[in-house]
Amino acid sequence: MPLYKSQSIKIYNSLSGEKEIFSPINEGNIGMYVCGPTVYSNVHLGNVRTFMSFDVIYRYFLHLGYKVRYIRNITDVGHIVDDVDHGEDKIAKKAKLEQLEPMEIVQRYTVDFHNVLKAYNLLPPSIEPTATGHIIEQIEIVKTIINKGIGYESNGSVYFDVVKFNESNHYGKLSGRNIEDMLANTRDTDGQSDKRNHQDFALWKKAEPEHIMRWPSPWSDGFPGWHLECTAMSTKYLGSHFDIHGGGMDLKFPHHECEIAQGEACTGQEPVNYWMHANMLTLNGKKMSKSTGNNILPSEIYSGGSPFLTKAFSASVARFFMLQAHYRSNLDFTNDAILAAEKGFYRLMEAIGSLKNTAQFTTSNTTSIDIKAWKQNCYDAMNDDFNTPILIAHLFEGVRFVNVLKENKETITTEDLLDFLTTMNAFVFDVLGLEDEKLATNNNDKLDGVVEMLIQMRKQARDNKDFAMSDQIRDQLLALGIQLKDSKEGTTFSI
């Protein structure tokens, strides 16, 4: 029997403002969509925290035995500077500044995004679709919304009529806004805008002559509005009604509000059952900002190349630090805080290392520690809206168990010892996604040794003029992602 049948999860639903018992549309299966990055610059540490939060949620669902289709998109067109309808596409602007093609910018920062998430041990999603790969689907949604009488064309652009939509729906329900208040608090453009109402948002934008990224449509050569892509990709891969939609708190309005409106306009029903939002990461009590210099790149954590840090920290320590706060809570990053987290992380890893060496524990016919209650406490923490700080507190109770068992102050049966070890491993490594650095270092050392041995074999083959064998070793290593570089000084490799 899968674990999920014995556990009841409560999720804080941003739409209702309450914790609700999670009940997937199809038993045993979960459809989850998370808004991914706009790839025009390096992701910052706050982005990593958001994606890490949903990584843990994804991991926990998998641990419980759910079959999860996890979609996380890449925004590579349509995201206008300052998140408005008029202006320059963020990627196109970056391309002009660096005198590159837009897709060169997309490729560069998509690779950076993947490298960062890999370093922080995030699992890849089931599908990672791009906005540019779904232009046809977006055009079809625009047609549907126009046919429903809620979208309108104006000078080659198409807009969503929020006033018309609000006649039979509630635009603003996710963010707690009222359409009348929004309209009253916006300036009259005196006919200067293509929109009927200032709050109307773009479904399709006509491209200016100098705009690089453009596609043909029934209305104009142009590009889709930012909000449209997520509706198109989520419905394509998860259907018009799915379980969970997540993202950063900053996306609640207007992005997610507009997604709800688009979905309801197309189908007449709520597109998503549970809306989830992860909170911000600040630096020394202030918002992270590149323009003010109050910013740390994810790579600066483990390189130590930041003026805000006194030393380098492993990505796993940074992950542990961020999971010590609940995903809906604001978290302030400071040097002192991550130093304290590092100490806790090593205590936890040391305890698990001891626990794996079961020979040092004397087992008994009885267990004086309530392992079953402790185990359920771990599940209860995650079942309560994925409360990682409470889970970590229970894991440190497990650290205490390890210490008293080593000192023979408590007793444990062989069966309970195995259950204890299995549970600690499951929550620390599988659910929280932490990595044992000593094990990783040992594995890296072994890999280095194997590659160096193959380099020497290749050198010997070349000395013997067996160039076919030399090339075979080089090509097979390259197929595994290991590139050899020959120079006068010898051969080195990179991964």
Curated annotation (Swiss-Prot):
Gene Ontology CC entries for this record: cytosol
GO molecular function terms attached to this record: ATP binding; cysteine-tRNA ligase activity; zinc ion binding
Cofactor binding description: Binds 1 zinc ion per subunit.
Gene3D superfamilies assigned: Cysteine-tRNA ligase, C-terminal anti-codon recognition domain, HUPs
Enzyme class: ligase
Position of the signal peptide: none
Enzyme Commission number, as recorded: 6.1.1.16
Motif 'KMSKS' region: chain residues: 287-291
SUPFAM superfamilies given in the database record: Anticodon-binding domain of a subclass of class I aminoacyl-tRNA synthetases, Nucleotidylyl transferase
Residue numbers binding ATP: K290
Residue interval(s) of motif 'HIGH' region: 37-47
GO BP field: cysteinyl-tRNA aminoacylation
Subcellular location: Cytoplasm
Complexes and interactors: Monomer.
Family as reported in the entry's similarity comment: Belongs to the class-I aminoacyl-tRNA synthetase family.
Name of the protein in question: Cysteine--tRNA ligase
Taxonomy of the source species: Bacteria, Pseudomonadati, Bacteroidota, Flavobacteriia, Flavobacteriales
